[in-house]
Amino acid sequence: MKNKIITFGEIMLRLSPENNERFTQCHEFEAVYGGGEANTAVSLANFGVDCGFVTKLPEHSIGQSAVNSLRQYGVDISGIVRGGDQIGIYFLEKKTSQRPTNVIYNR
């Protein structure tokens, strides 16, 4: 029997201004999916560890995009339940030498 690591948690959509801009300066955001447990599953998969992720995501195209982002790294997505209307979003203004990281959650 082969061992497998399963992570449980929320995957969120992260929106960040490009080019280290502030929220008040930007006109476009870079979109990336992540979250502590999802990031762990992706990291393990990158090291060749058999792993899966368990969560609930909406049936719409944003939910499917989150599923696809995990699948592309080789994470087993068979434990993902589909339903509901929303995915958590957070805005991340990246740290520079002059300012700290700024995070705003929208759940």
Descriptions of predicted regions:
Residues 20-23, 67-69:
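Short, glycine/charged-enriched secondary-structure capping and boundary segments
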